[in-house]
């Protein structure tokens, strides 16, 4: 499975129920890089959407350079990601192997640094819940959202409808956002998180002076089965390599680079593009797909589907 998260503003968010307005982005899942690129062409349609003020006018054919290979491209390897605590040795080896394959195909591997990337998770779990609290407040069961019938009064309707309409994680983030935006707390957490966001965005801008695309893990471990992990902290840590690009607004995508030996489940390489140069990551992804072949269905899922 190939997944694409475009640069913020490339695809219109019109029609999307907002969770975090500065973080939400629409992108495709596909069985191949070419399919993902074709889906991107359909989503973008060559222009901005007047229904979304963040939408940019992009006139790019995302399939145009899929066959060009990576010769002459500079691929960034970031020690902050590759030496991160908690990164599974098997995942690390697969990403390093992917780098070697790209180098053999003519790319140049360049070591880069994102000095503030380690602070991305802390900043995200301030900014995300704050935006979620603001956006989801409209779902009051009267004007918008799920409504429990037969309540004795309006307060009970609000309480039961919001409790029943939102899942556990959504409620957790709404409550956290409410606290973080409260008087006396806002200046202590929200404002510094925005400053960290600016620093991370600048880090990526500086990094792309030297590279055309960054190669990194998607997750610190192989894919896990649905329901296997219930601890919220462990779930949050599974996003440790993808959060910084959401904060910065850069495009990123996942492309399979093999299956875990023990689990038989996929390992993904993350490709991170400069802002509004999403075609770069698709070009590199197409080369990796040629190296590894199109992703097979994981045996565990193939068996379940028989």
What residue spans do the PLM features occupy?
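A glycine- and small-aliphatic-rich helix-loop capping segment at beta-alpha/alpha-beta transitions
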Residues: 1-3, 232-233
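A short helix-breaking turn/cap at a secondary-structure junction
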Residues: 2-93, 97-98, 151-160, 290-306
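Conserved catalytic core of Hanks-type protein kinase domains
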Residues: 42, 126-127
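Short acidic loop-to-helix transition motifs that present clustered carboxylates
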Residues: 58, 117-119
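Short, solvent-exposed loop/turn segments at secondary-structure boundaries
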Residues: 86-90, 123, 228-230
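N-terminal G-site helix/loop of the GST-like fold
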Residues: 88, 103-104
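Glycine-rich, small-residue loops and helix-cap segments
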Residues: 101, 108-109, 119-121, 128-134, ...
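A short beta-strand-loop structural module common to alpha/beta enzyme folds
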Residues: 111-115
């Amino acid at each position: 499975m190939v997944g694409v998260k475009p640069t913020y503003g490339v695809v219109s968010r019109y029609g999307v129920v907002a969770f975090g307005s500065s973080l939400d982005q629409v992108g495709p899942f596909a069985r191949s890089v070419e399919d993902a690129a074709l889906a991107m062409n359909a989503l973008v349609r060559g222009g901005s959407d007047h229904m979304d003020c963040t939408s940019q006018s992009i006139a790019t054919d995302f399939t145009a350079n899929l066959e060009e290979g990576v010769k002459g491209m500079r691929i960034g390897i970031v020690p902050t990601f590759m030496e991160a605590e908690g990164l599974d040795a098997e995942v690390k080896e697969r990403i390093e192997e992917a780098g070697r394959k790209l180098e053999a195909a003519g790319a140049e591997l360049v070591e880069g640094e994102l000095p503030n990337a380690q602070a991305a998770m802390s900043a995200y779990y301030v900014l995300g819940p704050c935006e979620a609290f603001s956006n989801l407040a409209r779902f009051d069961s009267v004007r918008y959202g799920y409504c429990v019938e037969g309540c004795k009064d309006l307060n009970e309707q609000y309480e039961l409808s919001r409790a029943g309409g939102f899942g556990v994680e959504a409620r957790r983030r709404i409550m956290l956002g409410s606290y973080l935006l409260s008087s006396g707390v806002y200046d202590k957490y929200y404002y510094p998180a925005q400053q960290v966001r600016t620093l991370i965005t600048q880090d990526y801008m500086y990094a792309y002076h030297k590279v055309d695309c960054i190669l990194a893990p998607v997750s610190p471990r192989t894919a896990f089965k649905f329901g296997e992990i219930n601890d919220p902290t462990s779930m949050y840590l599974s996003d440790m390599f993808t959060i910084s690009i959401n904060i910065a607004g850069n495009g990123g995508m996942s492309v399979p680079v093999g299956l875990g030996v023990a689990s038989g489940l996929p390992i993904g390489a993350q490709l991170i593009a400069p802002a509004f140069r999403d075609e770069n990551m698709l070009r590199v992804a197409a080369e990796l797909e040629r190296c590894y072949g199109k992703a097979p269905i994981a045996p565990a899922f193939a068996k379940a589907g028989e």
